[in-house]
Design a protein with these regions (language model features):
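Short, small-residue-biased leader/transition segments that mark boundaries at the very start
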Residues: 1-7
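Intrinsically disordered, low-complexity polar/charged tails and linkers
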Residues: 9-150, 156-158, 164-187
Length: 187
């Protein structure tokens, strides 16, 4: 199935995870901003408040609808922990905030190095489902359908994977790109 990637193990590094949760209850943002330290709230600039956690180092966006979006985590566990810590702190202000809520991973951004330079013009000509406009952006955009991820390929051999919901999808996306580039003698 993967004749080329067995030659070496592609090291995938998670750069950022975006997760969300809905606590099913409206939140009075002014109360939260006054009660918690590390909160930025300016309704004219942004409809939610930004709460920065030190451990794990993340930022949570809190909206009056009760929806939270956490960004900046480097692992799924840290992402979930950040949301749980944020909700626990909010519960000290509003004890009616439910203890049960679902956390969804929305996006994983990961990077890898293919250990080989790429001729992006040749890749754009040979590889399907790509966009390459070097005047607009130095990377080549490669869209995969399985797994459903978008890869940014750079001439240096660096790759950024976005849109993954799991670490394994990010890794599989990079491996499939490597295999396809190998099949076409582009790497």
């Amino acid at each position: 199935l993967f004749p080329y990637t067995t030659l070496f193990d592609l090291d995938i590094k998670i750069e950022n995870i975006v997760a969300s949760a809905s606590i099913g209850k409206d939140i009075v943002l002014t109360e939260v901003s006054e009660a918690l330290e590390g909160v930025n709230f300016n309704r004219e600039q942004f409809p939610g408040l930004v709460f920065k956690l030190k451990d794990p180092k993340t930022a949570a966006l809190i909206f009056s609808s009760g929806k939270l979006v956490c960004t900046g985590a480097k692992s799924i566990d840290d992402s979930k922990l950040a949301i749980k810590k944020t909700v626990d702190l909010m519960r000290t202000i509003d004890t009616e905030i439910p203890h049960e809520f679902e956390i969804k991973i929305q996006n994983i951004v990961a990077s890898a190095n293919l250990e080989s330079t790429l001729n992006l013009e040749a890749v754009a000509l040979e590889l399907e489902d790509t966009e390459y406009e070097p005047e607009q952006f130095p990377g080549l955009v490669y869209r995969l359908s399985d797994p459903k991820v978008v890869l940014l390929l750079f001439g240096s051999g660096k790759v950024v994977c976005t849109g993954a919901k799991t670490r394994s999808d990010a890794k599989l996306g990079v491996e499939r790109a490597y295999d396809r580039l190998s099949e076409l003698d582009l790497i």
